[in-house]
């Protein structure tokens, strides 16, 4: 019966009906989410982005995606979204800002997961002939970790980033010709180790634990290793415990870019 009704409807009317139904469905869905999650879901899931990267940058993005898909299969984007075009565009703007000196960029990433963002940013730096050292801090726990209870959706989730994830990430780096130093420790311990060794960086991406005091601790320690005029990227800045850090950056640093997922700042 429904099929016959659809066939009898003019195409324009049917399209309008589907748009209206989708709108009502999305409104109901949003009302069912915690208030802290509604804007994030709207921007990250419901919003369509028409982003076209420059050919050179799109080539880097698709190369990383193809390599990740070959290693991880259908789960290549697990717990990431780093290669979504609108997010990749933010990374491009960040890399362009830090590459202005035409000197090798020393890059530190806290929380590398499957290696997508590390590979993309490293590829963009290499394409601009400013690739320096690449360092990743990630504990890669045996059985993963639990996150989300204090997040926007107020729902704890078992995150399957394990020792096997590290092995696969290293395969990805090798396939892309990237030499990544992995510090397999919690972010606080890894950052203190870098401070003790007088290591400094031009670009730092904070993508560790987003809950409780972890974002504040990571941010404070990162300021000790960020070089003058260095650039810092905040991940998942719409999470409740990351928002105060973003407010500080908005007030005291120079914003380079902001997406629904990341925000980048230069510290003078």
Predicted features, each with a name:
Residues 2-268:
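A short alpha-helical cap/connector motif
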């Amino acid at each position: 019966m429904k099929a016959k009704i659809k066939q009898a409807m003019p195409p324009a009317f049917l399209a309008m009906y589907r748009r209206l139904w989708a709108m009502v469905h999305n409104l109901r869905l949003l009302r069912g989410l915690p208030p802290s999650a509604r804007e994030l879901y709207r921007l990250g899931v419901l919003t369509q982005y028409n982003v076209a990267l420059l050919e050179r940058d799109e080539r880097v993005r698709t190369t990383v995606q193809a390599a990740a898909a070959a290693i991880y299969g259908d789960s290549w984007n697990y717990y990431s979204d780093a290669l979504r075009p609108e997010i990749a565009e933010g990374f491009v703007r960040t890399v362009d800002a830090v590459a202005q000196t035409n000197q090798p960029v020393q890059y530190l990433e806290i929380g590398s997961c499957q290696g997508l963002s590390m590979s993309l940013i490293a590829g963009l730096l290499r394409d601009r002939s400013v690739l320096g050292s690449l360092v990743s801090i990630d504990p890669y726990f045996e059985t993963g970790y639990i996150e989300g209870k204090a997040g926007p959706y107020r729902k704890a989730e078992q995150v399957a980033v394990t020792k096997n994830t590290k092995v696969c990430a290293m395969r990805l780096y090798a396939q892309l010709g990237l030499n990544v130093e992995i510090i397999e420790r919690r972010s606080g311990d890894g950052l203190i180790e870098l401070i003790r060794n007088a290591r400094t960086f031009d670009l730092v991406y904070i993508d560790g634990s987003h809950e409780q005091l972890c974002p504040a601790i990571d941010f404070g320690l990162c300021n000790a290793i960020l070089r003058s005029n260095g650039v810092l990227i905040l991940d998942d800045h719409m999470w409740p415990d990351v928002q105060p850090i973003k407010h500080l950056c908005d007030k005291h640093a120079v914003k380079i870019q902001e997406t629904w997922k990341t925000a980048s700042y230069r510290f003078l």
